[in-house]
C-alpha cells in the first residue's frame, strides 16, 4: 500500500509513475487528495470546537461561583452543542478514512525508475543469458511424453483424483522432485537463510498483507467454510511472520527460506503453453524472503538474483534473466527480475523464478517497521522475495534437455540427492 502522505505531497508523480504499469491513477489520486482536503477542513473545525469547549468548561465553574446561574446554564448548553459537533466531526473523519483506505488498496506499487515501459511479456528486457542450448536428436520428446515413457509423472491419474493441473509423481519422478527441494533448501541455508516450515493455508489478513488480496482473490483457492486461503506461494505466510512488528534496524536483514506446495487456480489459462508441467494448479517451490533496510534493499535484490542464478548454473540449464516491463509486473512489485530456462524439446523459454523488491508497499500493509537510533519514530522496512526455485518447469527442462537414446542424464549436483545418475 502506498504511503498516504507521499500521495498528498506528490499526486502528479504518482499518476505519472503508475502509467508505466498501464494504470490510470488520476481519478483515485484526485479523490484521495480531495478527501484529505475535506478532512483537514473538518479537523480545523473540530480543533476550534474543542478549544472553545475547553475554554467554556473552565468558565462554567467561575460563573457558578460568582452566582451567574443563567450564564452558567447557557455555557453548559453551549458545551453540549459543541460535544455533538465534535461527535459529528469524528463520524465524518471515520467515513473519510474508510473511503481513503478503500481507494488506497486499489493503487499498485510504484515501479522503480529502471523499469522499462511495455504492455506485456514481449516488452520485457533481457539483461543476461547463460548456459548452452543443447542440440537434441530429431525425435526428441517433450517432457510429458518422457514422463509417460519412464513412468515418472501420471497426469491422467491426477485428473482422476482431483482434476487437470494436479499431477501424480511416482518412482524416480518423485525422487527427482524431492532431490530438487532438498538441493534448493540446502543452497538457501548455505546462503544464510533460516528455514521455515509454514502452514499451507492463511487467513484473510495474511493474504492482504502481501498483496494477494484483494488483487488476486480470483486466482486463490478459498476455503469458504473457515474463510481461509490455500497459499499461492510461501511468500505469503513467511512474510506475514513479520506482520505488526517493530524490529531493530541492527538485526536487518532477516533472511528466511521455505519449501511449500503452492496452489493457484490459473483461471483463463489454456492452449499449448499449459501442457504437462508448464502450468499447474498445485506445484512445489522453494521461496527466499528478506526483510531489509530501505538503504540496502536494492543491494539485497542483486544478492538474491545472484543466488537464483547460481542454482540454474549448478543445474547446467540454459537460462536468461529479464527485467520485467511495467505492464508485466505484479500489483505489489517495484522491480522484478524473471528467470527463464530453455526447454529444448518444446523450443521455448519457461519461467522458473521471479525475484522482486516491493520496497515499503507490503510493509505498509503489514505494519512492519524498524527502529534505529537516528529516527524519532519507527520507519517502514522493505520486503523482497524470490522463487529459488519453482520445480515443475525445472523438471521439464531437465527431462527434455538431458534426454539421450539411453535415457535421461541427471545433473551432477543432484546425483547425491537422487541416488541415481540416469533415468532409463
Regions found by a protein language model. Give the residues of each.
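TRNA-recognition modules of translation machinery and tRNA-sensing kinases, especially anticodon-binding
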Residues: 26, 129-424
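N-terminal alpha-helical targeting/anchoring segments
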Residues: 1-134, 148, 152, 156
Amino acid at each position: 500500500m502506498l504511503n498516504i502522505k507521499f500521495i498528498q505531497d506528490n499526486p502528479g508523480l504518482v499518476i505519472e509513475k503508475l502509467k508505466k504499469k498501464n494504470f490510470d491513477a488520476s481519478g483515485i489520486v484526485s479523490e484521495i487528495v480531495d478527501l484529505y482536503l475535506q478532512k483537514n477542513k473538518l479537523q480545523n473545525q473540530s480543533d476550534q470546537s474543542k478549544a472553545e469547549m475547553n475554554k467554556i468548561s473552565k468558565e462554567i465553574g467561575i460563573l457558578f461561583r460568582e452566582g451567574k446561574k443563567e450564564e452558567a446554564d447557557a455555557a453548559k448548553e453551549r458545551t453540549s452543542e459543541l460535544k455533538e459537533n465534535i461527535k459529528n466531526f469524528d463520524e465524518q473523519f471515520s467515513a473519510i478514512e474508510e473511503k481513503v483506505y478503500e481507494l488506497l488498496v486499489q493503487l499498485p506499487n510504484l515501479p522503480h525508475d529502471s523499469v522499462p515501459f511495455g504492455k506485456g511479456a514481449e516488452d520485457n528486457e533481457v539483461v543476461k543469458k547463460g548456459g548452452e542450448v543443447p542440440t537434441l536428436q530429431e525425435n526428441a520428446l517433450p517432457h510429458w511424453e518422457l514422463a509417460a515413457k519412464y513412468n515418472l509423472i501420471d497426469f491422467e491419474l491426477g485428473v482422476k483424483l482431483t482434476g487437470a493441473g494436479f499431477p501424480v509423481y511416482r518412482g524416480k519422478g518423485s525422487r527427482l522432485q524431492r532431490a530438487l527441494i532438498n538441493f534448493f533448501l540446502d543452497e538457501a541455508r548455505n546462503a544464510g537463510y533460516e528455514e521455515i516450515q509454514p502452514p499451507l493455508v492463511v487467513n484473510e489478513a495474511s493474504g492482504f498483507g502481501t498483496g494477494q488480496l484483494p488483487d488476486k482473490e480470483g486466482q486463490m483457492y478459498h476455503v469458504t467454510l473457515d474463510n481461509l486461503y490455500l497459499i499461492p506461494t510461501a511468500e505469503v505466510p513467511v512474510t506475514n511472520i513479520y506482520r505488526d512488528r517493530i524490529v531493530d534496524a541492527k538485526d536487518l536483514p532477516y533472511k528466511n527460506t521455505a519449501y511449500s506446495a503452492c496452489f493457484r487456480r490459473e483461471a483463463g489459462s489454456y492452449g499449448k503453453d499449459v501442457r504437462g508441467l508448464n502450468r499447474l494448479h498445485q506445484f512445489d517451490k522453494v521461496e527466499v524472503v528478506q526483510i531489509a533496510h530501505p538503504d540496502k534493499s536494492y543491494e539485497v535484490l542483486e544478492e538474491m538474483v545472484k543466488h537464483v542464478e547460481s542454482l540454474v548454473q549448478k543445474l547446467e540449464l540454459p537460462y536468461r534473466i529479464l527485467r520485467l516491463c511495467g505492464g508485466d509486473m505484479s500489483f505489489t512489485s517495484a522491480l522484478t527480475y524473471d528467470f527463464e530456462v530453455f526447454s529444448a524439446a518444446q523450443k521455448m523459454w519457461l519461467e522458473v523464478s521471479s525475484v522482486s523488491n516491493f520496497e515499503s508497499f507490503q510493509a505498509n500493509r503489514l505494519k512492519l517497521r524498524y527502529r534505529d537510533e537516528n529516527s524519532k519514530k519507527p520507519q517502514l522496512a522493505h520486503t523482497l522475495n524470490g522463487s529459488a526455485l519453482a520445480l515443475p518447469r525445472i523438471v521439464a527442462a531437465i527431462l527434455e534437455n538431458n534426454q539421450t537414446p539411453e535415457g535421461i542424464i541427471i545433473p551432477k549436483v543432484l546425483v547425491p540427492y537422487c541416488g541415481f545418475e540416469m533415468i532409463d
